Amino acid sequence: MKIIRFGVSVPEELLEKFDQIIAEKGYVNRSEAIRDLMRDFIVRHEWEAGDKEVAGTITMLYNHDEADVVKELLDLQHDYLNEIISSIHVHMDEHNCLEVVIVKGKAKRIKEIADRLLSLKGVKHGKLVMTGTGKELV
């Protein structure tokens, strides 16, 4: 892979803040931090476009005592067999469970799955986290 050097003009205060943050995060140089930001920018753009293949997790915290929430979660997961790769279930306490659903597919479809799962009655909190599949990232 060929590396290209280019210059960027930014306000001094912005660069100082950027340098402070990348040092806190343990980056060895600005180049690697900028490459990570560029990759993230590309992944988010592809996600918004909706037609690119992405991977991700849908994390949900729910009360399993809530009427039908477990059945509805399982039914919805079976509706998306092609996109749902796996799920992990953790008992948080006697009432609350954490479910992490690992997904892969077209961004629009993954967003649809997350919207349906996270809107179920009994789901207290949840979040969709998207990333690329790695195929198009350098």
Curated annotation (Swiss-Prot):
Gene Ontology MF terms in the entry: DNA binding; DNA-binding transcription factor activity; nickel cation binding
Cofactor note: Binds 1 nickel ion per subunit.
Record protein name field: Putative nickel-responsive regulator
Alphabetical GO biological process terms: regulation of DNA-templated transcription; response to nickel cation
Superkingdom of origin: Archaea
HAMAP family documented for this protein: NikR (MF_00476)
Cofactors demanded by this protein: Ni(2+)
Keywords: DNA-binding, Metal-binding, Nickel, Transcription, Transcription regulation
Family that this chain belongs to: Belongs to the transcriptional regulatory CopG/NikR family.
CDD domains in UniProt: RHH_NikR_HicB-like
Organism: Thermococcus kodakarensis (strain ATCC BAA-918 / JCM 12380 / KOD1) (Pyrococcus kodakaraensis (strain KOD1))
SUPFAM superfamilies (alphabetical): ACT-like (SSF55021), Ribbon-helix-helix (SSF47598)
Residue numbers binding Ni(2+): 78, 89, 91, 97
InterPro entries from the UniProt entry: Acetolactate_synth/TF_NikR_C, ACT-like_dom_sf, Arc_rbn_hlx_hlx, CopG, CopG/NikR_regulator, Ni_resp_reg_NikR, Ribbon_hlx_hlx, TF_NikR_Ni-bd_C
